[in-house]
């Protein structure tokens, strides 16, 4: 979310910078946990959790079981859908764990609390990379182990270069690291969308 200001003092709020272009002379991020007061003409933080500061939580005890249950619940909540859905599987630890949890719940409908069979009981997983990339092999290994319908999307360097203009337009940054990470995801998202999977 962004907030922008024009020379006449009008305040604009938009979810994309593109919407403020041509209207505002200056703009800035509308930070989470803040509100804007037109009377005071400034942003004020209203929401702050104690765990925002490491010192406040550094001595907390952690329960492996509580973390396990919270992670499973968080993934399960996201699986309510009336359309086919899939997971992005890089082969790394995070995506592998999340994909395995999603696969665990894929055969039954979350909406019926597991009482009904899912309309599409096979979870699709997706990986993207240049041909021969080691991440693709790791993703395939995980997909085979957890039993997803796996789709490996290969792209060429030229396809990546051709997509950069669109990627920059959508992510609204020229940051090299962000563009480099977003380009394969953009190409992958186009394929997933064309398959009718969310």
Describe each PLM feature range.
Residues 179, 187-198:
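Active-site adenylate/phosphate-handling loop in enzymes that bind or generate adenylated species
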């Amino acid at each position: 979310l962004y907030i922008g200001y024009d020379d006449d003092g009008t305040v604009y709020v938009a979810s994309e910078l593109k919407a403020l272009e041509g209207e505002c002379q200056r703009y800035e991020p509308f930070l989470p946990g803040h509100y804007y007061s037109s009377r005071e003409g400034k942003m004020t933080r209203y929401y702050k959790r104690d765990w925002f500061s490491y010192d406040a939580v550094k001595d907390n005890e952690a329960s492996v079981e509580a973390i396990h249950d919270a992670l499973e619940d968080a993934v399960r909540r996201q699986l309510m859908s009336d359309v086919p859905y899939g997971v992005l599987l890089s082969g790394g630890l995070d995506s592998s764990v999340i994909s395995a949890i999603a696969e665990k719940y894929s055969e039954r409908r979350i909406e019926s609390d597991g009482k009904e069979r899912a309309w599409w009981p096979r979870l699709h997983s997706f990986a993207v990379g240049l041909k021969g990339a080691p991440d693709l092999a790791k993703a395939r290994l995980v997909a085979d182990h957890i039993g997803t319908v796996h789709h490996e999307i290969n792209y060429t360097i030229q396809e990546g270069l051709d997509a950069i203009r669109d990627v920059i337009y959508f992510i609204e940054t020229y940051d090299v690291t962000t563009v480099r990470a977003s380009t394969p995801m953009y190409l992958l998202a186009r394929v997933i969308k064309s398959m009718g999977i969310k």
